[in-house]
Regions:
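Soluble cytosolic regulatory domains appended to membrane proteins
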Residues: 3-143
Length: 143
C-alpha cells in the first residue's frame, strides 16, 4: 500500500480537481486551517474540563442510566465510582440500548455490565495532539 502525504489524503478525501465549486474550496480551506491550528497544541487544550463531563455513576441502575443517556446529546458516557475522578470505563449508548432490551438487566447497576463497559485511556495533559491523534487512529479509539 502506497503511503500518501497529508496533503494527498486531504486532496483525495475532498476529491480536489479543477472543477471544485466554492463550497468545496471553503471546506478544504477550513480543514487545512484546523490542521494547522492544532498542530502545536497539547491534549489539555482540547480536553473536556472535568466539571463539564457528562458521566454516569457506576451504582445507577441501567434503567436510570439509559433514561439519562437518552436526554443527552452524546453517544459515549464515562462511568465513574464514587466521584468523577474515578473513571472505570465508558459505555456506548448503542450498547446500553442493547442491554436495556433485556428486562432482567434493567435493575442492575451499570458497573455489573462489565462486558459492555469499555476501557478508557488516560492521556497526559502534555501529550501533543499530533501524537494523540495518531495513537487514537492506530487504536481506532474515538473517546
Amino acid at each position: 500500500m502506497e503511503k500518501k502525504s497529508l496533503f494527498q489524503r486531504i486532496r483525495q478525501s475532498l476529491k480536489l480537481d479543477d472543477e471544485m465549486d466554492e463550497a468545496q474550496i471553503r471546506k478544504a480551506a477550513g480543514l487545512i486551517r484546523n490542521i494547522f491550528r492544532y498542530m502545536d497544541k497539547d491534549a489539555k487544550d482540547i480536553m473536556t474540563h472535568r466539571k463539564n463531563i457528562v458521566a454516569i455513576d457506576a451504582t445507577e441502575t441501567l434503567e436510570d442510566a439509559f433514561q439519562f443517556m437518552l436526554g443527552e446529546s452524546y453517544s459515549r458516557f464515562p462511568i465513574y465510582e464514587e466521584d468523577i475522578d474515578q473513571i472505570i470505563g465508558f459505555i456506548h449508548l448503542r450498547e446500553a440500548a442493547t442491554c436495556y432490551l433485556d428486562e432482567s438487566l434493567r435493575k442492575r447497576p451499570v458497573k455489573e455490565l462489565d462486558t459492555y463497559i469499555r476501557s478508557v485511556s488516560f492521556i497526559p495533559e502534555t501529550k501533543s495532539i499530533d501524537k494523540l491523534f495518531k495513537e487514537m487512529q492506530a487504536k481506532k479509539n474515538h473517546i
